């Protein structure tokens, strides 16, 4: 079981309804559907020894056409903080986003006070591009987000060119 939230970004304990096998299967099937539609790609991170869910990373709202971009997000449960899991997952997802999904740009929105996520983003080559004021509704209020982004060229991966529509 997870401990109570450690700060405002920590999701803390989950209710039994969120942890059931049927609910987990439902989430996985929904994610498979979004992946088939080229809209969402995710990685789950598990501890090697215990098999415990450590966290995850996602490419969300994939944009094709002129943008060839996606939003990048991640989370790590508090018992696993400061062990490198987040960095390993986000690094892998950046590589997948550029090499396998064929994206050109990835963007993360990070709350300005979330120093650990900012350090993680910068350590992987994301640069700060600005601030979106009152960008998302979290914890019952509108929250500002720092905009951090990386392109495939920034990390030395050649862009594959415009994605061709997949047959449906």
Walk through the language-model features, giving the residues of each.
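A structural signal for short, well-ordered beta-strand segments
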Residues: 57, 72, 106-108, 122, ...
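GNAT-family acyltransferases
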Residues: 1-79, 96, 142-168
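Conserved acetyl-CoA-binding loop-helix of GNAT-fold acetyltransferases
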Residues: 75-76, 82-99, 115-123
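Catalytic-loop Lys-Pro-X-Asn motif of eukaryotic-like protein kinases
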Residues: 112
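Structural motif
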Residues: 3-6, 101, 124-125
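Short, structured loop/turn "capping" segments at alpha-beta junctions
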Residues: 66, 102-104
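Conserved catalytic-core motifs of GNAT/GCN5-like acyltransferases
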Residues: 107-109, 127-143
């Amino acid at each position: 079981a997870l401990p109570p939230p450690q700060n405002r970004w920590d999701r803390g304990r989950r209710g039994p309804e969120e942890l059931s096998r049927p609910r987990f299967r439902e989430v996985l099937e929904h994610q498979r559907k979004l992946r088939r539609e080229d809209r969402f790609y995710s990685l789950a991170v598990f501890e090697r020894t215990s098999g415990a869910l450590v966290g995850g990373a996602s490419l969300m709202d994939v944009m094709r056409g002129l943008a060839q971009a996606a939003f990048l997000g991640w989370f790590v449960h508090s018992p696993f903080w400061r062990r490198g899991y987040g960095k390993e997952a986000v690094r892998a997802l950046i590589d997948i986003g550029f090499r396998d999904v064929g994206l050109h740009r990835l963007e993360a929105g990070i709350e300005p006070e979330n120093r650990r996520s900012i350090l993680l983003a910068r350590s992987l080559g994301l640069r700060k591009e600005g601030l979106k004021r009152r960008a998302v509704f979290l914890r019952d209020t509108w929250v500002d987000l720092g905009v951090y982004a990386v392109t495939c060229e920034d990390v030395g991966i050649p862009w594959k060119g415009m994605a061709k529509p997949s047959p449906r």
